[in-house]
């Protein structure tokens, strides 16, 4: 098991450069400080780590266990992905069996780590609540959730809740630069900015994009957008500006080119349009941005409901061309 994990770590940079101790964690300073206090006291309550993907929740749990128990911490921790093993049978069998066995004298307690706990069924959560009460003497539970509101209140009330925020821009870019140096990858500053924008504070996604782009050679903005399957923002802005200038046919041709060259769906296009509307590179009054954002939302809803991509996006460009006439003096 450990050998296969090591192979994966060598292949995936997100695993290879995953922090192993609390001191190595990027950002989340306040949370790390509180977790270090638990290590110092060798005691802690049940924990609920909540926040968006890629913000370090699972990593923090592993680092906490490592700092508590040492290099062999995995023998004192049961890790389950609750989205795969979410039913009451798993809770009653695996978790109960692990929790009921006593720990060695030098180990204060064992840890049950439930990743994606917000995907557990209601019955499984009720069973978990009872186990948390029964085995507090030997076991601590760490629950990880993207949506903590899906965790039943009786469990939330038994946990210390830690809310992980998206990582700060400077921390993401600094980490990416460091990884690029370790892997001897050449990367443009503009590409770092693009990776950060695309990852939206998700460090795991940022590292995966970096690794994928690095496979093509020097990491540039173009290679970044190529590996994520999105159009370069510059080209999206060109399409918008053509439509607003009243060049409907040219805008339509640009749209067709983008969809063919990048394999974009209608939803992909409208999401990128929505992002670029608020770019400082597009000079239109805020009142028009509001109208376009509202229209983009309407078009996306129709696309998700199954409407034809080409017809809806052409209608969107036509509306932009109509709005553009009002912009002209």
From Swiss-Prot:
GO molecular function term, any single one: ATP hydrolysis activity
Gene Ontology CC terms: DNA replication factor C complex
Domain of life: Archaea
Keywords assigned by UniProt, alphabetized: ATP-binding, DNA replication, Nucleotide-binding
Entry keyword annotation includes ATP-binding: yes
GO BP terms, alphabetized: DNA repair; DNA-templated DNA replication
Binding site for ATP: 51-58
Short name of one Pfam family: Rep_fac_C
HAMAP family registered for this protein in UniProt: RfcS
Assembly mode: Heteromultimer composed of small subunits (RfcS) and large subunits (RfcL).
PANTHER family on file: REPLICATION FACTOR C / DNA POLYMERASE III GAMMA-TAU SUBUNIT, REPLICATION FACTOR C SUBUNIT 4
Family to which this protein belongs: Belongs to the activator 1 small subunits family. RfcS subfamily.
Function of the molecule: Part of the RFC clamp loader complex which loads the PCNA sliding clamp onto DNA.
Protein name: Replication factor C small subunit
Species per Swiss-Prot/TrEMBL record: Staphylothermus marinus (strain ATCC 43588 / DSM 3639 / JCM 9404 / F1)
Gene from which the chain derives: rfcS
């Amino acid at each position: 098991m450990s050998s296969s994990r090591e192979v994966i770590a060598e292949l995936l940079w997100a695993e290879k450069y995953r922090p192993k101790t609390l001191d190595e964690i990027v950002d989340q300073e306040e949370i790390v400080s509180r977790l270090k206090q638990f290590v110092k006291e060798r005691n802690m309550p049940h924990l609920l780590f909540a926040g968006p993907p890629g913000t370090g929740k699972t990593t923090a749990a592993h680092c906490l266990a490592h700092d508590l128990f040492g290099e062999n911490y995995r023998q004192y921790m049961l890790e389950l992905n609750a989205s795969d093993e979410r039913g009451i049978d798993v809770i009653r069998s695996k978790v109960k069996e692990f929790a009921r066995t006593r720990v060695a004298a030098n180990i204060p307690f064992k840890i049950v780590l439930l990743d994606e706990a917000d995907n557990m069924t209601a019955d499984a959560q009720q069973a978990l609540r009872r186990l948390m009460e029964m085995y507090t003497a030997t076991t601590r539970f760490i629950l990880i959730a993207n949506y903590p509101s899906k965790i039943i209140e009786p469990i939330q009330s038994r946990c210390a809740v830690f809310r992980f925020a998206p990582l700060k821009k400077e921390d993401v870019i600094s980490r990416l630069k460091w990884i690029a140096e370790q892997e001897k990858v050449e990367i443009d500053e503009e590409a770092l900015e693009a990776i950060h924008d695309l990852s939206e504070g998700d460090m795991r996604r940022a590292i995966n994009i970096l690794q994928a782009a690095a496979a093509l050679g020097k990491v540039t903005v173009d290679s970044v957008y190529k590996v994520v399957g999105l159009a370069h923002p510059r080209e999206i802005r060109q399409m918008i500006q053509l439509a607003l200038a009243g060049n409907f046919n040219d805008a339509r041709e640009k749209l067709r080119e983008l969809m063919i060259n990048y394999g974009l769906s209608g939803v992909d296009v409208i999401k990128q349009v929505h992002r670029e509307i608020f770019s400082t590179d597009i000079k239109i009054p805020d009142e028009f941005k509001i109208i376009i954002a509202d229209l983009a939302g309407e078009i996306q809803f129709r696309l998700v409901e199954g409407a034809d991509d080409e017809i809806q996006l052409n209608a969107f460009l036509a509306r932009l061309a109509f709005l553009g006439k009002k912009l002209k003096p």
